Structure formats: C-alpha cells, structure tokens
Amino acid sequence: MRVLIACEYSGKVREAFRALGHDAYSCDLLPSDDNSPFHLTRDCWDVIENRFSTLRGGWDLIIMHPPCTALAVSGNRWYGSGMPKHQQRLDSIEWTMALFEHAKKHAPRVAFENPVGVLPIKPTQYIQPWQFGHPESKKTGLWLHNLPPLVETDN
C-alpha cells in the first residue's frame, strides 16, 4: 500500500509502516530527523497531489499530523477570542480543514490527529495512549475518512 505521512519529520510513523512492508513516505517543510530517503522535504499540499515526478501513482492512505499549537484548547490563553494570536488560530482552522478536504480528493483513505481542540467538525473518535499500551495520558482526536475507528489493545 502507498502511504503518505504528512506533517511528519520524525519518521516514526513512516518507519512503522515501512517495517510492515508498505511503500511509505513522510513529508514536511522540515528535513527528517533520520535523514531518510523516504522523506520529502516539500509542502504537503504538493506531495498529496503528487505534483512532482519522483513517485508514480497516487496514495492509498494519507495520515496527517497538522500543527496543533493554535488549534488545541490548551492554547486558549494565547489564541482564544480577543487574544493577540486569535487570527492565527482562525487561519490554522481554515488551513487544517482545507487540507483534510484536499487529502480526501487524492486518496481513498485519510486520517488526521490532533489533541482536543477547536476544529468545527467533531473527530470520529478520541483515543488515549494508555488504550494502546503506553502509560501516558493525552486525549487525541482522530478524524477518519473511509477508515474504521481504532480498537484499543490495552485498558
């Protein structure tokens, strides 16, 4: 399966898919932490649309990690209504929602994650790391298109 992990420079998710035998790539405006040849230092909009000739064919799955700084409710102190960075929040909401729609036009299955935030559409589900074998707690929303909700592996 051809997989794109957008807005990722760590390579962690990309490498997990590659370890399972998928043709996975990551992209971000930043270079990858692991200097992988499977990371594209490009704008995710272009990579989603495959506007370059490096890869043939489209994506089967796109997973996105859009920046959450302005979107998370934890930032209300700086990004809330009437605050100096409120317009940045509004721009981030518009960008993230447009990116989700853009990805859905270019792949049959799409997911993106973000912590509890201010996006205008509710996530398909909320998950916690402890539901999947990690001791941390961080409520995270998943917006899924043509994908089933995750089923917890630990509780």
Model-predicted regions and their roles:
Residues 1-155:
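Conserved active-site and SAM-binding loop architecture
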